[in-house]
């Protein structure tokens, strides 16, 4: 043990593990509280962020398994290898479009890696027909984590960290 070893001890994090969630869509991060649907804005289904999307695809934001892609193709759940239960819901009232403007690429129960395409969408059509295109990305089992750190600003699908969860 050297004379200086006690001088440079790094402060240990109070969390044992950090799990990063990447952007499933490109666009701008919006506060979840600003989504025009109380189910999301009041965090009834979980905590997270929303994205004002650009582009035309929704990618896997984590390595894991697709739980369910809704028949209307506007939303899906994914469970990560670490047990994160994540829900991506494109737009508000998009269920009423019954799949119009969406094309499913991935399948229920499919294993996916970060960046794999899950759903393609026609942004111009959805801007015209949906009540809102704000896309909530929420952690439905948020109570299992000690802390959530949310990013802000412009993001790139499959590249930018949008949230970090800590155990």
Swiss-Prot record:
Q: Which Gene3D superfamilies match?
A: Glucose Permease (Domain IIA)
What InterPro entries does this protein's entry cite?
A: Dup_hybrid_motif, PTS_EIIA_1_perm, PTS_EIIA_component
Task: Give every PTS EIIA type-1 domain span.
Answer: 37-141
Is-annotated flag, keyword Hydrolase? no
- SUPFAM superfamilies per the UniProt record, alphabetical: Duplicated hybrid motif (SSF51261)
Can you tell which superkingdom this protein's organism belongs to? Bacteria
Which UniProt keywords are given for this protein, alphabetically ordered?
Answer: Cytoplasm, Kinase, Metal-binding, Phosphoprotein, Phosphotransferase system, Sugar transport, Transferase, Transport, Zinc
Q: What does the entry note on its domains?
A: The EIIA domain is phosphorylated by phospho-HPr on a histidyl residue. Then, it transfers the phosphoryl group to the EIIB domain.
Q: What is this protein called?
A: PTS system glucose-specific EIIA component
What is the scientific name of the source organism? Answer: Buchnera aphidicola subsp. Schizaphis graminum (strain Sg)
Q: What is the lineage of its organism?
A: Bacteria, Pseudomonadati, Pseudomonadota, Gammaproteobacteria, Enterobacterales
Q: Which gene encodes it?
A: crr
């Amino acid at each position: 043990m050297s004379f200086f070893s006690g001088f440079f001890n790094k402060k240990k994090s109070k969390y044992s593990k950090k799990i990063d969630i990447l952007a499933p869509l490109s666009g701008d991060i919006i506060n979840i509280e600003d989504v025009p649907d109380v189910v999301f804005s009041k965090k009834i289904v979980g905590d997270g962020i929303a994205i004002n999307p650009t582009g035309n695809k929704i990618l896997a934001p984590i390595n894991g398994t697709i739980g369910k892609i809704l028949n209307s193709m506007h939303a899906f759940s994914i469970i990560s290898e670490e047990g994160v239960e994540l829900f991506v819901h494109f737009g508000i009232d998009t269920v009423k479009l019954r799949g119009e403007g969406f094309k499913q690429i991935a399948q229920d129960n499919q294993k996916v890696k970060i960046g794999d395409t899950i759903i393609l969408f026609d942004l111009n059509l959805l801007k015209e027909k949906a009540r809102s295109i704000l896309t909530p990305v929420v952690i439905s089992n948020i109570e299992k984590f000690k802390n959530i750190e949310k990013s802000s600003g412009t993001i790139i699908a499959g590249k930018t960290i949008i949230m970090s969860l800590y155990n």
